[in-house]
A protein has these predicted regions:
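Solvent-exposed loop/turn segments at secondary-structure junctions
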Residues: 51-54, 66, 73-76, 99-103, ...
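Boundary at the C-terminal end of the N-terminal hydrophobic targeting segment
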Residues: 22-28
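Core dinuclear metal-dependent hydrolase active-site scaffold
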Residues: 36-38, 59-60, 152-175
């Protein structure tokens, strides 16, 4: 699976929370909070869910669309996040679901992207067991509906979505 993607998301979330980037703006929502950062050629939106898992969802806003990295899992966050996305006024081009395969059921199969190997991993004992634990703990508050399909991207390679380059690389063998 793609450990590098997971590390990037973790680092972005950590830096966003610490203010290292120097937030260009912040939007307080009812449940979560969004911090925005102007980067070279795109804008980064980090939605801090403030849910029981402390998750963050990242949106890369390119010139002609949005790419979402890891959807929120809780239904109330999904609803709030959808409203935020609508306010950006650009279409969602891709939803990259690396370690968060929940929350993507409302997107078309050609919008949902899983990195090579993630589909099998999500059905396995480790990830599948974690999701079963979430179901037991949070019940109907989380969205674990099956998605209709997805595009799979190789663990090595580049994709350009919304005018922004996304590089994928294979993670550690233990990942």
């Amino acid at each position: 699976i793609v450990n590098a993607m997971k590390k990037i998301l973790w680092i972005v979330s950590l830096l966003a929370g610490s203010g290292v980037f120097g937030a260009q703006g912040a939007a307080a929502l009812l449940k979560g909070e969004v911090k925005t950062y102007d980067m070279d050629g795109f804008r980064l939106h980090v939605y801090l869910t403030q849910d029981a898992l402390g998750d963050a969802t990242t949106v890369v806003e390119g010139r002609d669309g949005l790419v979402i990295l890891e959807m929120p899992l809780f239904k109330e966050n999904l609803k709030e996040f959808a409203g935020y996305l609508k306010g950006l006024g650009k279409p969602v081009v891709k939803v990259v679901a690396d370690y968060h395969v929940g929350g993507v059921a409302d997107y078309a199969p050609d919008q949902v992207v899983l990195v090579e190997g993630m589909s099998e991993f999500a059905k396995g004992a480790v990830y599948g067991g974690m999701l079963e634990g979430f179901k037991a703990a949070f019940g109907d508050a989380i969205d674990l509906r099956e998605h209709a399909g997805h595009e799979e991207v190789p663990a090595e390679g580049r994709r350009i979505w919304a005018g922004v380059a996304f590089d994928f690389s294979r993670g550690a063998s233990s990942d």
